[in-house]
Structures are given as structure tokens and as C-alpha cells.
């Protein structure tokens, strides 16, 4: 759909993620990228020169000239930056996690409602093509298992691994399992930082579904897998390689012989394997387009402020259990 109106956007924080936001905004038709702000003025000017946009020396000047901003600053600064942007009448896309504190997240949502502004939270895996292939309406998980492992990076150590990495899988989990949480058992350790670097959480839902989430930022290699078990069905999602495999248990023999059919010994059950052909695309482009479309159409974004709040509520429950175990 073509719109006559163009959204004036800015990017706050031009570190690792912020640079990608600037790059992708330049590819969206309904956007005018006004400029960037970063406390590192040298880096802000470097990005501004690369994309021929303005490097603002004062944060307030940027938000006062924009309709919307991406907030790509450290988590500890999210609340202050986002609040000022909302009060300056800006819609905001705020990188995950929404804040480092539940009360702060609730306050941002309250302000956004008062000013009729959109909050979108950057849980980018929701836009991963491997997840987008799923028909969420037909999924009834009984058990979910996720592993999200990453090599150590000093850049991400301002928060625990639960808020840094596991938060992605918490958000996806809450989107899949529409049920209250009954119990959480969790453990974690610090290894290379003064925060939790490795964590595991078992989450039990009132509808009987159980999830086991593992996250580590001290791995030798990356791994981002999410496994969904249903009655007679298993789905394996690889977020890193954008692939999805499905195994379905069926008592009906397929119409024709297939190399993707596994027959049990007594041949009364068939395991039918399939691997989706997923067309790759840039998830950030889709995320930013969703943000802009939400503004233009006044729609709820795919990942709202409420979704971001729900994710950190569970994350802090997990961290509470970890701290209780570590202090025994």
C-alpha cells in the first residue's frame, strides 16, 4: 500500500544495532530518516556522513523533529530515553528488553496510552522466517525446549543472560502458550562477568504445557533452536539457519512411497518428515516495516509494549529463582 504521508524517524544509539536501523530505514519508502544521536559524537558523525543525515548534538532536538525513533541504547538507559521520546510526542521502537525494571516498563506503557503513541519492542525473532512459517492458531504445545547459545561478547554484559538472550525465547513461548504460568524452577551461574552468563529455566503452565529454556553467552559457537512437541507432532525451528523441520506421527499409510516416511517396526505407525522451503529475508526490515505500518494505520504492532512487559515479568521471576538458589 502506498501512503502520501512520510514518517520522520530518528535513531538513538548508533552502536552495533543502531547502525542497522539507520541502514534499513533508508530502504523503507514511507520514511524520512532525520538523523541520529549518540553520546559518542564521533561515531554519530561517522554514521551521519555515511548516510548523509544529521548527527544531533542534543537528544531533545532529535526527538522534537521526529514522528518516531528507534532506541538502540544500553538497556539501563531505555527508560529515560523512551520516556523523553514519548513525552516529545514520538512513537518508539525500543530494542529488547523493554527496560531493566518492571515498574519502568509499566510507566512507559501508561505514558504511551496517555499520548496515544505506539511502543514496539525489538523481539526480532518474531519476524524470523523460520517462525513466520508456523500456523500459530493450530499449535497446541505439550512440551517446548529451546537452546540459545552465543560466544562471549563484552558488549552485552550490562544485563544477565536471561534479559540478553533468553528473553527472545520467553517472548516466543508466551506467544505460543496461551496459559498462565503455574511454576518456575531455574538455575544459573556467572562465569566471565558479574552477571548471570548461563541459565536454565523450567516453566510449567496451568494448561499442562512445560517449557525448558537454556541460554548461554559463554559458548564456543552459536545455537538458536526452538523445539515444539505436540500430540503426534514435533517441530524443530532453527532461528540461526532459518529452517524448520516437522515430524508427524500418522497411522494412515501415505498414498505413495516417499523417502521422507519412516516406518515403525510393526508398520502400524508412520513418521512423516518434512522440511519447509523458507524464503530468506531480513527480519529487521520486516520489523521496521511493521513499526512504520502500525504508525500509518494506527494498528497494534506485532510485538507491543505489553508483550515486552510480559517477557520481562517472566524473566525477573526466573532471575529471582536463580538468585534464591545461588544464595542457599
Q: Where are the regions a protein language model picked out?
A:
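Beta-loop-alpha module in the N-terminal Rossmann-like domain of NAD(P)-dependent dehydrogenases
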Residues: 21, 51-109
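A contiguous active-site-proximal alpha/beta segment in oxidoreductase catalytic domains
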Residues: 99-156
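Mid-domain beta-loop-alpha active-site segment that forms a flexible
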Residues: 122-129, 152-183, 196-197, 308
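C-terminal glycine/acidic-rich active-site capping loop/insertion
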Residues: 124, 232-302, 328
Amino acid at each position: 500500500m502506498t501512503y502520501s504521508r512520510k514518517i520522520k524517524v530518528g535513531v538513538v544509539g548508533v552502536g552495533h544495532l543502531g547502525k542497522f536501523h539507520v541502514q534499513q530505514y533508508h530502504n523503507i519508502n514511507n520514511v524520512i530518516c532525520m538523523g541520529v544521536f549518540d553520546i559518542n559524537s564521533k561515531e554519530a558523525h561517522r554514521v551521519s556522513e555515511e548516510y548523509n543525515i544529521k548527527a544531533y548534538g542534543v537528544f531533545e532536538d532529535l526527538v522534537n523533529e521526529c514522528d518516531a525513533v528507534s532506541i538502540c541504547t544500553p538497556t539501563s538507559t531505555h527508560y529515560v530515553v523512551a520516556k523523553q521520546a514519548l513525552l516529545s510526542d514520538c512513537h518508539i521502537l525500543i530494542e529488547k528488553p523493554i527496560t531493566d525494571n518492571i515498574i519502568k516498563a509499566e510507566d512507559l506503557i501508561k505514558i504511551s496510552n496517555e499520548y496515544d503513541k505506539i511502543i514496539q519492542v525489538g523481539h526480532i525473532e518474531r519476524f524470523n522466517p523460520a517462525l513466520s512459517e508456523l500456523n500459530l492458531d493450530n499449535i497446541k504445545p505439550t512440551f517446548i525446549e529451546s537452546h540459545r547459545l552465543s560466544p562471549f561478547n563484552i558488549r552485552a554484559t550490562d544485563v544477565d543472560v536471561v534479559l540478553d538472550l533468553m528473553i527472545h525465547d520467553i517472548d516466543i513461548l508466551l506467544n505460543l502458550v496461551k496459559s498462565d504460568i503455574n511454576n518456575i524452577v531455574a538455575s544459573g551461574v556467572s562465569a566471565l562477568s558479574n552477571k548471570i552468563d548461563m541459565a536454565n529455566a523450567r516453566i510449567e503452565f496451568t494448561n499442562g504445557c512445560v517449557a525448558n529454556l537454556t541460554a548461554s553467552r559463554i559458548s564456543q559457537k552459536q545455537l538458536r533452536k526452538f523445539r515444539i512437541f505436540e500430540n503426534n507432532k514435533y517441530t524443530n525451528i532453527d532461528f540461526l539457519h532459518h529452517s524448520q523441520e516437522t515430524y508427524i506421527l500418522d497411522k494412515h499409510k501415505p498414498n505413495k512411497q516417499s523417502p521422507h516416511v519412516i516406518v515403525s517396526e510393526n508398520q502400524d505407525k508412520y513418521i512423516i518428515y518434512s522440511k519447509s522451503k523458507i524464503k530468506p529475508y531480513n527480519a529487521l526490515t520486516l520489523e521496521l516495516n511493521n513499526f512504520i505500518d502500525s504508525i500509518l494505520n494506527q494498528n497494534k504492532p506485532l510485538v507491543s509494549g505489553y508483550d515486552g512487559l510480559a517477557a520481562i515479568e517472566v524473566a525477573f521471576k526466573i532471575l529471582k529463582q536463580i538468585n534464591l538458589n545461588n544464595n542457599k
